[in-house]
Amino acid sequence: MNTIEGTGTKPANVVVRGNASGFLQEIVSGAHQLRADEPVAVGGSDAAPGPYDYLLVGLGACTSMTVGLYARAKKWPLENIVVSLRHSRIHATDCAECETKEGMLDRIDVEIGLNGALTPEQRAKLIEVAAKCPVHRTLKSEINIRLRTAPSGSLSESVVTKVESRPTETAKRTAEEKI
């Protein structure tokens, strides 16, 4: 399998399985099992975060990890990081710094709390570093999403098996060791 250029890591493989009668989705990402849903107001059961929540989770986690990694490498006194994110749709005319001038566009507001005895210069550098997290850069770059139809039945059985299986004892021990 190819690696993601410049990272040495393999591309993520996520499988999402849903029932056509509702919004609740079962998600398998490596050894992790998640769910996604929509709020009751739009027809979901609000049993799990929604798709935009997961988008924000990815950006927030990557931002926090990147800032923490940089601060540790510099041995700066950063105690913890809190990243708060909000997604909204706005009119392009309400965004002076945006290239798009007509219609609607997506906005993600990010607030970063940096706790610790940091100098103003260190805080400014950490905010600069936050904008360089890989997920932030992906969202700001051109994205080519290739959609195709899988052969009938080729995904359904393997996904059911993965979603319904329980972690092995080895997987449980590995997860516990990471904690």
What are these regions (language model features)?
Residues 66:
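Conserved phosphate/anionic-ligand binding catalytic regions in large, soluble enzymes, centered on
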Residues 1-57, 69-179:
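Extended beta-strand/beta-hairpin segments
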